[in-house]
Amino acid sequence: MEHVPGSFGTSASFALRFGQTIFSAASLIFMCFDFDFYDFTTFCYLAMVMAIVTPWSILLALTDTYSVLVKLLPQELRVLSIVFAGDFVLSFLSLGGACAVASATELLASADGKICDGSLCIQYQVSAALAFLCWFLLLASALFNFWSLPSLYY
């Protein structure tokens, strides 16, 4: 089997997973700095998605680490299909959450500052920006794994 750079079990995949873990955890931390995010559904949605993406990325980063160090992880069609499907679904969930939080924060900030003070809106904007970065890395992982799927059929 030919390894595509960035596909599951490579060092480039580990780098993508490490970035996903950092960005999703940071987005979750910035979202949870304030307890008022429970008042808005979009903020709860992003916190929930990032709470799912973080362990997913950690688990796959550990698997990539094992694969790179031991060089013993076999590439199976079923495993790679599950990883691709998980990355693909989570990438669009995180894109939806990031877009929703970015638009809700902009709406709250434009309401004359009555609802969202300066530092709180900045925290939400940083959380949305980190979620966008996490989405980009998740989509890149999904595309690299999708690219390597056909080589497992032969």
Curated annotation (Swiss-Prot):
One of its GO terms (cellular component) is plasma membrane. It comes from the Eukaryota. The chain crosses the membrane at residues 18-38, 42-62, 82-102, 129-149. Residues 39-41, 103-128 are extracellular. Keywords: Cell membrane, Membrane, Transmembrane, Transmembrane helix. Its main location: membrane. It is found in: Cell membrane. It is a multi-pass membrane protein. Residues 1-17, 63-81, 150-154 are cytoplasmic. Belongs to the Casparian strip membrane proteins (CASP) family. Homodimer and heterodimers. This is CASP-like protein 5C2. It comes from Arabidopsis thaliana.
